[in-house]
């Protein structure tokens, strides 16, 4: 029903915009003979002059705030030679949203996945972050995450001036992805041309309140920007700082799983166990940005870009988990009620809940530096040399401690398909006289601790030469090369926790008690809470855990990629129709290697260092054509061959091997350092109608991507002689050829979709509506790719078939207000699962509504503005579910994060 309403809304919007277009459409006149006789170089100079004059006129009428951001983004879209989407700052240090990920997620065909209530990863046209790349000022960036996909909450929106998402390739664009390329851009001080100082402060509050003792539900955000020019505008400086101190409060329920049982003669899905947790998080991020530009002459300009971000998260989770399935726990079932194929409610007798007090800490550091040099050798020749480095480090500690009662308990359970289930226990789990530190689940440990570490470093150098032409068809040619070297490593140490007194149950010291966690959302009054870190330091000892699963998390991947390219820039006439764009080709060669461990026969103590790799190359042609049918109407076409490099955890050299005694042959499984990239051929077509002199637009686009290969696990023939087999003496197979299961380049498939977008300032239609406006988008994407291999049914990770966004705003006389909604249908997403590994989950579709209202003062208070924001207005839940062929969908996880209120002020002078 939600999707039907969205589709109806978009249909009505389309009809309205068609009428708007017809009101303002003008008959296109043929280009005059003077324009047709111009060379491409002269037409380009004329276009730049007209763009500069347009920008000058905008400054004269002082377009500010919401409309300034919209019009700047439209201008970027209109002038680009690729099919792009853009977000532009409304003012210095002020993008439309508090998070850059949320701003990007409002663009047509893009969607964000929430992690702990925050938008972090972005899907472009139905493809997850693994298929895109992220640039900062045109330079490839590394990630503090598990793979290549950038976590966008590392980049404060206050330090960025714009974001451009390239949906079609350009031969000289660095490290492009199959789904798209996201370029985060900081301000250019010499282009701004004036001194600006901006100060911003906001108070933040979470509506959920304090879930865990010791955690505030309030926080703040502050930022400062300074931009200036010196030495007769030959030196420009931009400095920025942004701090985020933000609370996170989560009410969370997870299911262990379901078993199909016959209950009262009916087949029913039986909830096997549950986790009821309250999670509180402290998020502290400091971001720094510096830009120094130097343009001492008409023949040289240089720019030094520096970016640093440190993000510290401390998260405490408290609550309980309880096994419910009688065959596993020895419990007994009473009063069962089955509805819709699900055991809706029941009483479970003789259960033993495990009380959890966990603490997770994560520290991410990102540093990027780049030095760009541009040279003008003559009226026709220019050059560029750019050197950069990007580095990320991530350190985590994941600590679990367990407690429980000495005896067993009873519980009444009621399951809710679209909300929190409720649990009514017999015991009081806040009572320190009842609860002890112990192993109530019989897991053989009293706790557990993990220390994952990631390091990712990329260095690159880029050289480009450009030649302008006095041609009626081609404006010039660009050619050059980019060299990059990247190393990403992961390591982890893990240990069991044992209570110091020989693992005997221990009472919780009174000086460690801090109250109880609020778990009332699931019917549980509370769960005992204590200082997790201090308990770990004083009450437990560690017992190192070494096994094959842990060694599989210890790897390093090295890759050197060299890209050479040539691009012919098109600027001519097709009859009376101006045509611009480019025709390019690039050759990408990659040399990759991975180091890890090979584990024989599951014996981790006998692990062997193992190294493997490969090299390959791809020729990637690309074409972008822009047909200017009239001054308002543009048709764009793009075609290209594309690649996205494989996931780094799939490239790991780690593996295990042994003897299959049944088949009497070698067998094993692991990563694949010889993986080649995902490869695709793509086609794009877009129609754009720019309204009211570029203040609004309507666009419709269609795309087709033919993935020639996809990476999924396959069992292949493998020569095991690459390993040391001397440790095997019994039942040794006669041949070293056996069967090995690993990620492999296999069958691909197609992805198709269409997108519709619009932006209409109503004041251009009727003066009485001055200040009102609306913008939005709708996309429909379908895929025939089977990510688990032929014959499987799981959809492509990151793909929501339907994605829509709409924003309505009013801005006039200093007053502004805006309400936005972004929605996506159900999809497969990635989360951090058991063992700190990545897991895929079915995630329910969601609608997120944000609201803001503000006022910008004038007169003697000119430069001061105030703002009130409410994010996640409806407290939209995050839901996961189980989906299997032949079974009903079963609720897997239900989380609520609360609303976020922000009240603040900005002063610019």
Predicted segments, located by residue:
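Short loop/turn motifs that connect adjacent beta-strands in outer-membrane beta-barrel proteins
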Residues: 173, 189-196, 231-235, 299, ...
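Outer-membrane beta-barrel signature, preferentially recognizing the C-terminal barrel domain
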Residues: 351, 355-366, 553-557, 643-707, ...
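Gram-negative outer-membrane beta-barrel transporters
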Residues: 704-706, 723-832, 904-906
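Extracytoplasmic beta-strand/coil segments of soluble accessory domains associated
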Residues: 76, 101-140, 167
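C-terminal beta-signal and adjacent terminal beta-strands/loops
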Residues: 501, 706, 823-830, 855-909
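Short acidic/polar hinge/loop motifs at secondary-structure boundaries
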Residues: 139-167, 217, 224
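N-terminal periplasmic "start-of-domain" segments of outer-membrane beta-barrel proteins
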Residues: 60-95, 121, 129-132, 139
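Transmembrane beta-barrel wall of Gram-negative outer-membrane proteins
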Residues: 214-328, 336-338, 361-372, 621-623
